[in-house]
C-alpha cells in the first residue's frame, strides 16, 4: 500500500472518519463500514487530506488548469489540495488554480455562481469526497459546461466499489463512462480490506468481504 494511502487511513481511523460496525446507508443497504470525510476537522487532518489528493493527482499525470470543489463539501478540499499540490508538485503545479460554486448566484458585486478562478476555456478537475448516486457530480459537470470549460478528471477520497440501487455498475463507473473521464481515488474498498489486516477480527473483516462480494459491480 502506498504511503499516502496508509497515512490517510491511519488518520481516518484516528478521527473516526472511517468506522466499522453496522450502518444504514441512504440507499437502504446495511454497510459494515462508514466513511465521513467531514470529520477531518483540524488543520493537521485537512493538511493530510490535501496532501493525499495532491499525490493522487500528481501520480495520475492528468492535465488540468483548475481544481473545482462543488459546494459545500468540495470547497475546502479544492483549496487545500491546490495549496498542497503547489507544495509537493514543484513548478509544474505551482500556479494551478482553484474555484468553487455558490449554491445561489449573486446578482451584485462580482456576480455569477463561481468563486475563485475563472473556468472559461480551461481544463477542470472536480474534487469531492465520494460518488454515491452521482447527483452532485452531474450538477458539477453542468456548472462547468455552462461556464465554458471541460472536465479532465474527477478525484474522490473513497471509491466504495459497489453498484448503485438501479444499475449493475458502480456510481464511479457510471460517471466515468457517461462523461468519458477518469475517476481517481485516494482509496477504495479493497484498500480498506487490506488495511484492516490485524486491526479487525476475522469475523469483522469477513463481513466487509461479504459486503464487497454482494454489491461489487459484475461487469
From Swiss-Prot:
Catalytic activity annotation: orotidine 5'-phosphate + diphosphate = orotate + 5-phospho-alpha-D-ribose 1-diphosphate
Record-given protein name: Orotate phosphoribosyltransferase
Gene Ontology MF terms: orotate phosphoribosyltransferase activity
Protein family: Belongs to the purine/pyrimidine phosphoribosyltransferase family. PyrE subfamily.
Task of the protein: Catalyzes the transfer of a ribosyl phosphate group from 5-phosphoribose 1-diphosphate to orotate, leading to the formation of orotidine monophosphate (OMP).
Subunit structure: Homodimer.
GO cellular component terms attached to this protein's record: cytoplasm
Source taxon at top rank: Eukaryota
Gene symbol of the encoding locus: URA5
Family annotation (CDD domains): PRTases_typeI
PROSITE patterns xrefs: PUR_PYR_PR_TRANSFER (PS00103)
Enzyme category, top tier: transferase
Pathway(s) of this molecule: Pyrimidine metabolism; UMP biosynthesis via de novo pathway; UMP from orotate: step 1/2
Record-linked InterPro entries: OPRT (IPR023031), Or_phspho_trans_dom (IPR004467), PRibTrfase_dom (IPR000836), PRTase-like (IPR029057)
Binding annotation for orotate: 34-35, 132, 160
Keywords attached to this entry: Glycosyltransferase, Pyrimidine biosynthesis, Transferase
Residues reported to bind 5-phospho-alpha-D-ribose 1-diphosphate: 26, 72-73, 102-103, 106, 108, 128-136
Enzyme Commission number, as recorded: 2.4.2.10
BP-aspect Gene Ontology terms: 'de novo' pyrimidine nucleobase biosynthetic process; 'de novo' UMP biosynthetic process; pyrimidine nucleotide biosynthetic process; pyrimidine ribonucleoside biosynthetic process
Amino acid at each position: 500500500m502506498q504511503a499516502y494511502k496508509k497515512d490517510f487511513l491511519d488518520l481516518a481511523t484516528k478521527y473516526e472518519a472511517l468506522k466499522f460496525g453496522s450502518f444504514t446507508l441512504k440507499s437502504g443497504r446495511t454497510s459494515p463500514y462508514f466513511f465521513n470525510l467531514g470529520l477531518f476537522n483540524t488543520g493537521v487532518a485537512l493538511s493530510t487530506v490535501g496532501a493525499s489528493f495532491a499525490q493522487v493527482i500528481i501520480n495520475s499525470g492528468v492535465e488540468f488548469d483548475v481544481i473545482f470543489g462543488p459546494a459545500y463539501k468540495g470547497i475546502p478540499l479544492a483549496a487545500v489540495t491546490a495549496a498542497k499540490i503547489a507544495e509537493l508538485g514543484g513548478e509544474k503545479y505551482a500556479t494551478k488554480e482553484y474555484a468553487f460554486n455558490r449554491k445561489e448566484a449573486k446578482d451584485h458585486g462580482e456576480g455569477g455562481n463561481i468563486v475563485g478562478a475563472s473556468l472559461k476555456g480551461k481544463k477542470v478537475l472536480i474534487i469531492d469526497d465520494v460518488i454515491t448516486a452521482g447527483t452532485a457530480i452531474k450538477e458539477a459537470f453542468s456548472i462547468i459546461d455552462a461556464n465554458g470549460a471541460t472536465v479532465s478528471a474527477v478525484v474522490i477520497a473513497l471509491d466504495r466499489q459497489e453498484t448503485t440501487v438501479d444499475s449493475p455498475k458502480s456510481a464511479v463507473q457510471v460517471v466515468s463512462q457517461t462523461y468519458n473521464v477518469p475517476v481517481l481515488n485516494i482509496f477504495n474498498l479493497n484498500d480498506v480490506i487490506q488495511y484492516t489486516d490485524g486491526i479487525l477480527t476475522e469475523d469483522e473483516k469477513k463481513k466487509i468481504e461479504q459486503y464487497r462480494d454482494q454489491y461489487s459491480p459484475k461487469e
